[in-house]
Curated annotation (Swiss-Prot):
<dbReference type="GO" id="GO:0006790">
    <property type="term" value="P:sulfur compound metabolic process"/>
</dbReference>
<keyword id="KW-0884">PQQ biosynthesis</keyword>
<dbReference type="InterPro" id="IPR039068">
    <property type="entry name" value="PqqC-like"/>
</dbReference>
<comment type="pathway">
    <text>Cofactor biosynthesis; pyrroloquinoline quinone biosynthesis.</text>
</comment>
<dbReference type="InterPro" id="IPR016084">
    <property type="entry name" value="Haem_Oase-like_multi-hlx"/>
</dbReference>
<dbReference type="InterPro" id="IPR004305">
    <property type="entry name" value="Thiaminase-2/PQQC"/>
</dbReference>
<dbReference type="GO" id="GO:0033732">
    <property type="term" value="F:pyrroloquinoline-quinone synthase activity"/>
</dbReference>
<keyword id="KW-0560">Oxidoreductase</keyword>
<comment type="similarity">
    <text>Belongs to the PqqC family.</text>
</comment>
<protein>
    <recommendedName>
        <fullName>Pyrroloquinoline-quinone synthase</fullName>
        <ecNumber>1.3.3.11</ecNumber>
    </recommendedName>
</protein>
<dbReference type="Pfam" id="PF03070">
    <property type="entry name" value="TENA_THI-4"/>
</dbReference>
<dbReference type="GO" id="GO:0018189">
    <property type="term" value="P:pyrroloquinoline quinone biosynthetic process"/>
</dbReference>
<comment type="function">
    <text>Ring cyclization and eight-electron oxidation of 3a-(2-amino-2-carboxyethyl)-4,5-dioxo-4,5,6,7,8,9-hexahydroquinoline-7,9-dicarboxylic-acid to PQQ.</text>
</comment>
<dbReference type="InterPro" id="IPR011845">
    <property type="entry name" value="PqqC"/>
</dbReference>
Amino acid sequence: MSRAAMDRAEFERALRDKGRYYHIHHPFHVAMYEGRASREQIQGWVANRFYYQVNIPLKDAAILANCPDREVRREWIQRILDHDGAPGEAGGIEAWLRLAEAVGLEREQVLSEERVLPGVRFAVDAYVNFARRASWQEAASSSLTELFAPQIHQSRLDSWPRHYPWIEAAGYEYFRSRLAQARRDVEHGLRITLEHYRTREAQERMLDILQFKLDVLWSMLDAMSMAYELERPPYHTVTRERVWHRGLAS
């Protein structure tokens, strides 16, 4: 006998309860928040997270391409503009590059993606490929880790200037801008999710989709922990060179 569907309030509570697995609790992020991260670890995180940032518009474009609802598209497209930039606005990707410069990285090196670890690349690529293959509703719902994003952005704004005075203040603009953007995006994504998943089976699938996205974010930090905390980057027993691939054209 199938279980009854959760009502909207119960379903939303179940979604929010997934926050216990958000990457704000990963030891690598905790170390950054508590001021225990080295300059090299901060730089490694910024360089690798850039790959996630530049792929978010591709994920959102896949959702738009699969969505026949014009009203949804008109609202969702703002996410692409937030990252790529609208006319006269730099956008989030440019803001991230300024963060990279603020922590002492060369813009060209970050853009080259030469420091992106294979584990990070695999995790991000899995997310983008999911958005391309899934229904637009499922892909849109996978973005609901944004439920927990304002807290993580605020934690960086609260702790990093105190612990890492060597980071130039101009680099924090990305985190400031995402505070409002993430809250707006949550409202839209949550509305789509609560309206679309009406059966218990569908709701359980959505919770698993959200767990998949949480797995993506956690796995990225696992790869960075291996490379920058344990000092075991890929092929460390063979070479100290970055011999790993930098993305293959499809």
